[in-house]
Every structure is written in structure tokens, then in C-alpha cells.
């Protein structure tokens, strides 16, 4: 049921398929419907952060602060955008964070553990994933109740979709 979909990862290993646009517009629409929404920008291009009108270089607390070893509580990194709509922003370069995450135990559950304390505060948590199957995407898929996969309508996109579905099944087992 839709009510069971609290955490939704918007993912596709291809770039340019409207992951960020989908995340942003779905978040705004749900907030307008009086649902409390948290957006998470996991993309190292910080596209979601930029699309909501924020400047990644000016952010004091970002997803990096949440996911790094001995990181800050996610509650300290949430910014309100408008009524019912909040965001955890990203920065332009997440490569050092990804390298650090890869060296940790239970590395695929880092985001899940970080979000636990705030999950009950939101009706929906929407995660904008990077355009590759990185440790960040694996974290998003591990904590998601569902995955929204935007695709272009062509054969190569369809082939990529089946590969992503296989990866999702593997991660969730």
C-alpha cells in the first residue's frame, strides 16, 4: 500500500532521466497536500540542493555531516524550505565521503541508521540518488520502502531498468 511507502528512493544509474526533477516536484506536491516531507540530496552534483534555490557552497550542515564517521544527528542538518517541506542538502564533491563509507562495517546501512531518529516526524522521505550504483545509492536502496525509477522511453533505457531491478533485488535480500 502507498501508506507503507514512507522512504522512497528515486534512482536510476543513468543520468538525465529526471530523478532530481521528480524528487523535487513530488516533494512539493506532497507538501502542498499537507504531507510532511523530507528531501535528501545524495547526488554529488547537488542538483536537488540547487533546484530548491540553495547554494551548496554556503551550506553549514549537509548530508556529508550526517553520513561521515561519528557524524552529526540528521536533525541538525535539516533545513526548512516551506511549510511541510524540509531538505538535507548535498555538496559538489562526495567522493571523499564515499571512500570513507566504503571502509566501514555495515556500510550499506549508514543512511538507514542516520534517518531512524527522524522517520516518525515525516509522512514521506524522498531520496534523490546519484546516477550510478555507488555506496550512496546502495544506502538509499537499503533504507527505502520503495523505489521510483524515472526512465526515458527507449530500448537502452529499458535494458538499464532491468539491470537496476536486478541490483535492487540483490540489495534488499
Model-based region annotation:
Residues 1-173:
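P-loop NTP-binding core
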Amino acid at each position: 500500500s502507498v501508506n507503507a511507502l514512507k522512504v522512497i528512493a528515486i534512482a536510476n544509474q543513468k543520468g538525465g532521466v529526471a530523478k532530481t526533477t521528480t524528487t523535487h516536484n513530488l516533494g512539493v506536491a506532497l507538501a502542498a497536500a499537507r504531507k510532511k516531507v523530507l528531501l535528501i540530496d545524495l547526488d554529488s552534483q547537488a542538483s536537488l540542493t540547487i533546484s530548491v534555490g540553495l547554494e551548496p557552497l554556503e551550506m553549514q550542515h549537509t548530508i556529508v555531516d550526517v553520513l561521515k564517521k561519528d557524524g552529526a544527528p540528521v536533525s541538525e542538518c535539516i533545513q526548512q524550505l516551506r511549510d511541510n517541506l524540509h531538505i538535507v542538502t548535498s555538496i559538489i564533491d562526495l567522493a571523499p565521503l564515499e571512500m570513507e563509507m566504503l571502509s566501514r562495517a555495515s556500510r550499506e546501512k549508514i543512511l538507514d541508521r542516520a534517518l531512524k531518529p527522524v522517520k516518525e516526524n515525516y509522512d514521506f522521505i524522498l531520496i534523490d540518488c546519484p546516477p550510478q550504483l555507488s555506496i550512496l545509492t546502495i544506502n538509499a536502496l537499503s533504507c527505502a520502502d520503495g523505489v521510483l525509477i524515472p526512465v526515458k522511453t527507449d530500448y537502452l533505457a529499458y535494458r538499464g531498468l532491468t539491470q537496476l531491478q536486478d541490483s535492487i533485488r540483490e540489495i534488499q535480500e
